[in-house]
Amino acid sequence: MTDHNLLPEPKKILWRVSELNRNARVILEQTFPLLWVSGEISNLKRYPSGHWYFSLKDDSAQVRCVMFRHKNLYLDWIPQEGMQVEAQALVTLYEARGEFQLTVEQLRRAGLGALFEAFERLKARLQQEGLFSPEYKQPLPRFPRQIGIITSPNTAALRDVLTTLQLRLPSIPVVIYPAPVQGEGSAAAITTALHTAAVRGECDVLILCRGGGSIEDLWAFNEEIVARAIAACPIPIVTGIGHETDFTIADFVADARAPTPTGAAQLASPDRQAILHRLQYWLHRLQQTMERHIERRMQATDLLAHRLIHPGERIRHQQMHLLQLRGRLQNAWNRQVEIRTWRIEETGRRIHSAKPDIQAGIRHQQELAARLQRAMAHRLENLQFKLRQQQQHLIHLDPKAVLARGYSIAYTARGDILHDSRQTRAGDNVRLVFASGWAKADITETGE
């Protein structure tokens, strides 16, 4: 018979409370995935920190829950005591007290799960059909001639859109296609408004918008008939539905999506200030480009003018300059005539008011006209005289005039002009050009 008191006892593991709670928390979090739990809210407390503490219960049990501020901020509704909800949560243990609890990630009213499932099914089907594909998206016009708005009248969303359009570019006309955006029949009304806008074809872009709300409030924009009406519309559509965190089927099908109605108005309309700044920028660039182009042309013209040595070209330039001077002279003449005419009329008025000798005034007028005629004729004669001098000077510079005085030009066999006796040697052939005709010669001797 064995004496159990003599057997060695197994080694005992002694856990500290904190170690036990920590290991239990790890086991819970690793064992249970992120899951959905339904129940009734009770003992709801909202702390100044923004965190929410409550219990979820059913007929036979309850569990403690916490939803931290950075999670509950995204809710567009406020939970109330006794409300039936569905919570997506992580199963865990509050180590400090050893309390089993749920850390809630998302919270929705009971029954919305079916809506989310319907949303995901329709989204997947339309995506498979290609309604969300980028190649089907129409580009938004940069400068729309008219903008259409599809929303419910007398709403904050409509006021926000109209205010934004007025601030950005008040000259753009706006057409409102009224349609209820919430409740029974709203999806059909939105579809009708889209069809009306497409048939009338009076707008270059459409804004489909409404303010924030729950998933039920926004459900009209998740209906298939609305999605297909958007896809079939030949006019580009910008959606601005709810808040930044709200996404609807209409947002995925539309040509562009904005987080709010105000953002949709900004996407659909050009900014007047941005246009003005852009125009000023391009005007400045154009001015700089033109100035540089003119400067380059002026430099090229100066270079070409410097290289031109033919007297005929210089004569033509002088003739063009003379024509310019004639034009300026004619303009000056016209201005002087206008000035003299005004002075004569003014003198006539003075004569009429002072009752002087009319004949003396007429003689003064005739004298002024004669003096002006003589001055202009003298000026024109001087300009013509200078032109003749320039022409005569250029004629004297013509190489042919030098040849006419008995000189000749000698060319080598390659056609180069001979400037120096060292360019040739005895036995070379040269060509002599005279004022009239030419002759060949043989070099018999060279010297310096």
Swiss-Prot record:
It is an enzyme of class 3 (hydrolase). GO terms for cellular component: cytoplasm; exodeoxyribonuclease VII complex. CDD domains: ExoVII_LU_OBF. GO terms for biological process: DNA catabolic process. Keywords: Cytoplasm, Exonuclease, Hydrolase, Nuclease. Heterooligomer composed of large and small subunits. This is Exodeoxyribonuclease 7 large subunit. It comes from Nitrosomonas europaea (strain ATCC 19718 / CIP 103999 / KCTC 2705 / NBRC 14298). The gene is xseA.
